[in-house]
């Protein structure tokens, strides 16, 4: 089992001002507070096997250089250069870095990757060019740092067409000589069947090119059924990927609960790590296990202790 970090939202409480209004979301920290981003990476490197870049929503389509005051090429260069620097600064060559790339839907305001809303959800060519152009721009911005990236993580894919696009791109580019994984969104229990169908489609296309498959940013209450679903679908040579979030639940009018608020309190780091650690041997340990939104160093350090 390899342990992933808690994602980029853990940086938000550490910033001197809010960046929640930025379309770049946590990628805005690369623009305004690169020194805090380095400290964020260094903190997680102390307990995790893999750290992830702040590039989830970073894309030319939503980046305004006049507003940000920093050339996008420089921000792209820092996005991979800062984690590489953090790893080398701490002298931890056996730790890994994942280039984190969100869905095209993540560039549409309103967390649309969780609502499966795109401008053109079945436009294969548009989605292909979106992902291809972004990776090429990141690579060109800092070729030396890109060489030192270990994984490429295509995250929060909510639609089967985009999953097909990513599979084709990975095959065409021979994975950029990286290990590539794909994760889907699963915001509700009712969406597990959709996720299962997307994963089945990925496996039917070209799973030889895909290193790992799983689900990211889902509520802890969905961990058990999602883990069972992955166990039933994934062949032994594909790494299972699971990173649940640390959020609470809100109560719907019908009395059911859904991810997104604190009407039902979020699990404590102790509770989150205890539940998550139970799945550390899933898929015979061929697994990446970590955190997502609203998990932090405390969650992951406790998970490390419980999975030693």
UniProtKB/Swiss-Prot annotation:
Keywords linked to the UniProt accession: Methyltransferase, Transferase
InterPro entries linked to this entry: Betaine-hCys_S-MeTrfase_BHMT, HCY_dom, HCY_dom_sf
Pfam families the UniProt entry points to: S-methyl_trans
Residue intervals of the Hcy-binding domain: 1-307
A GO cellular-component term linked to this record: cytoplasm
GO molecular function: S-adenosylmethionine-homocysteine S-methyltransferase activity; zinc ion binding
Biological process according to GO: cysteine metabolic process; methionine biosynthetic process; methylation
Name the UniProt record assigns to this protein: Uncharacterized protein C57A7.07c
Organism encoding this protein: Schizosaccharomyces pombe (strain 972 / ATCC 24843) (Fission yeast)
């Amino acid at each position: 089992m390899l342990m992933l970090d808690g994602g980029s939202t853990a940086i938000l409480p550490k910033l001197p001002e809010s960046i929640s209004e930025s379309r770049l979301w946590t990628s805005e920290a690369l623009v305004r507070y690169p020194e805090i981003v380095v400290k964020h990476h260094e903190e997680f490197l102390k307990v995790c096997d893999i750290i992830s870049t702040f590039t989830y929503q970073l894309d030319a389509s939503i980046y305004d250089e006049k507003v940000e005051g920093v050339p996008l090429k420089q921000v792209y260069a820092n996005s991979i250069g800062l984690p590489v620097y953090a790893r080398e600064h701490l002298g931890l060559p056996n730790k890994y870095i994942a280039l984190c790339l969100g869905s095209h839907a993540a560039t549409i305001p309103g967390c649309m990757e969780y609502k499966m809303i795109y401008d053109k959800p079945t436009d294969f060519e548009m989605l292909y060019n979106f992902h291809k152009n972004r990776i090429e721009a990141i690579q060109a911005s800092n070729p030396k740092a890109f060489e030192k990236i270990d994984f490429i993580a295509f995250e929060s894919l909510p639609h089967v067409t985009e999953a097909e696009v990513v599979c084709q791109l990975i095959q065409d580019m021979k994975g950029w000589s990286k290990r590539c994984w794909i994760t889907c969104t699963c915001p509700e229990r009712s969406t597990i069947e959709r996720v299962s169908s997307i994963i089945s489609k990925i496996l039917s296309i070209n799973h030889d090119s895909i290193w790992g498959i799983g689900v990211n940013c889902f509520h802890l209450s969905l961990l058990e059924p999602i883990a069972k679903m992955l166990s039933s679908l994934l062949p032994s040579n594909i790494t299972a990927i699971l990173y649940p979030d640390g959020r609470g639940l809100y109560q719907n009018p019908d009395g059911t609960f859904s991810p997104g608020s604190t009407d039902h309190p979020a699990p404590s780091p102790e509770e989150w790590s205890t539940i998550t650690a139970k799945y550390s041997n899933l898929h015979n340990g061929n697994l990446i296990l970590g955190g997502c939104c609203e998990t932090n160093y405390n969650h992951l350090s406790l998970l490390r202790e419980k999975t030693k």
